């Protein structure tokens, strides 16, 4: 213990950052010097499963953020599985932004209401990775600017803008964005086409976020290498640019007037393709005239369900369109 006490606070904080947060907080009983050192780790993971939920969790997070003072926080994760007031969550987010945080992960169940993402998040110059889950409303301002953001994860986020496509506005303010994940939520007001446009985006995942009233999705991502789309097909894809696509995983579903034609045409450069449901095989067969020559495809995986007979109708078409195919995996 004497040898450890001889180390500087910076080194001790680095050592504590290698422990779980529960283990790190247990060191606070060692001495007065150690009482708050756990709070000065550059990486903070505040989880109600480790420190208790409800009011005790709120008090604990408040205490940690007060103790850190002006000390920089590089990465912080706040997770709470017990419902808490959204006012606390908003206050915490604003607080950590003032610490120059680079990685922010918020996963909290709110009480009866859904909180708003604070406007300060949309002008944070230090954020590199942002993850928001469990439901927030968001109003993207016209002055949004996230110059350092590379990873954006949105789960059950409901955009409220009615004068524009808020996701399009948000992405246009992220000049170095590389990874985008959207799960559930609502992208935009009914009058606007969904737009995913980014010249830097390399990985895109869209899951269970479609609503019947939406008309179309524009995907303009010339640098995209990985696409995972597990959702309803909209009425149309007005524009699709997937020139650099290497791998695609599709689990498509149809409504009465869905049209995936341009999405299917956009797969022409894909090298690895996974069709993750029988409905996907059915959709590709129904729109088989849109299937391009897959000149680079070397691995094809097809999963099925009760609609497995569509696989055998679709398979000869895909084989004919894939001159360089090396591996075929069929899971029935």
From Swiss-Prot:
Name of a matching Pfam family: F-box
Residues in F-box domain copies: 2-49
InterPro entries the UniProt entry points to: F-box-like_dom_sf (IPR036047), F-box_dom (IPR001810), FBL60-like (IPR055294), LRR_dom_sf (IPR032675), LRR_FXL15/At3g58940/PEG3-like (IPR055411)
Disulfide bonds: none
UniProt superkingdom: Eukaryota
PANTHER family: RNI-LIKE SUPERFAMILY PROTEIN
Protein name: F-box protein At4g22280
The organism of origin for this protein: Arabidopsis thaliana (Mouse-ear cress)
